[in-house]
């Protein structure tokens, strides 16, 4: 079974991933969690949520070698979880789909980048998923459900030509509803 958890930043994707993995561990299932090496915001060796919740993880490069590590190591476990899937190459979605035959696979990631465009790896994983859990955050400006991630530079929406990947937290990003999300110029 493949479960994909998506939404904007601050929606609780990592918290939900950890919650699900912990349930299986309590039930006696062997679980392994992976995270990309470039995600060092809160803890370099654990999957860490914005709210401080953490879980031990294997830190791997977000490249084809990392996908192979997930494929090989994951085959030895009952439950395989991968956080921040948007940072991995699109091949990860195929690996997760294959691993889901015979085990529980839980993946979490952003579905849209700061430009409002889909992350290819997340979109492909969603297509293969047995279940997609779409979470929303709370709009920083009005308090309504937020489905977008706004990148800010000095408090102003980042321009479209900014790098697609920029690791950060609430100092660089805000959750926004559709009404308050500003499409980058």
Curated annotation (Swiss-Prot):
Catalytic EC class: transferase
Keyword Lipoprotein listed: no
Record-listed E.C. numbers: 2.7.1.21
Residues given in the record as ATP binding sites: 7-14, 83-86
Reactions catalysed, as given in the entry: thymidine + ATP = dTMP + ADP + H(+)
InterPro entries the record matches: P-loop_NTPase, Thymidine_kinase, Thymidine_kinase_CS
Gene Ontology terms for molecular function: ATP binding; thymidine kinase activity; zinc ion binding
A matching Pfam family: TK
Transmembrane annotation, as ranges: none
Similarity remark: Belongs to the thymidine kinase family.
Designated name of the protein: Thymidine kinase
Source species of the chain: Pyrobaculum aerophilum (strain ATCC 51768 / DSM 7523 / JCM 9630 / CIP 104966 / NBRC 100827 / IM2)
């Amino acid at each position: 079974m493949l479960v994909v958890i998506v939404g904007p930043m601050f929606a609780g994707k990592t918290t939900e991933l950890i919650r699900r993995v912990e349930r299986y561990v309590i039930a006696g299932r062997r679980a392994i969690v992976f995270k990309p090496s470039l995600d060092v915001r809160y803890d370099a060796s654990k999957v860490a949520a914005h709210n401080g919740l953490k879980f031990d993880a294997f830190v791997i490069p977000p490249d084809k070698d990392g996908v192979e590590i997930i494929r090989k190591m994951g085959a030895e476990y009952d439950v395989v979880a991968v956080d921040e899937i948007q940072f991995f190459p699109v091949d990860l979605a195929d690996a997760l789909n294959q691993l889901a035959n015979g085990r529980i696979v839980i993946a979490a990631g952003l579905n849209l980048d700061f430009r409002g465009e889909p992350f290819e790896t997340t979109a492909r994983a969603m297509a293969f998923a047995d279940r997609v859990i779409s979470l929303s955050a709370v709009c920083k400006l009005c308090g309504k459900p937020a489905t977008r991630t706004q990148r800010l530079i000095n408090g102003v929406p980042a321009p479209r030509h900014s790098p697609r990947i920029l690791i950060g937290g609430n100092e660089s990003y805000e959750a926004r509803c559709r009404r308050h999300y500003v499409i980058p110029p």
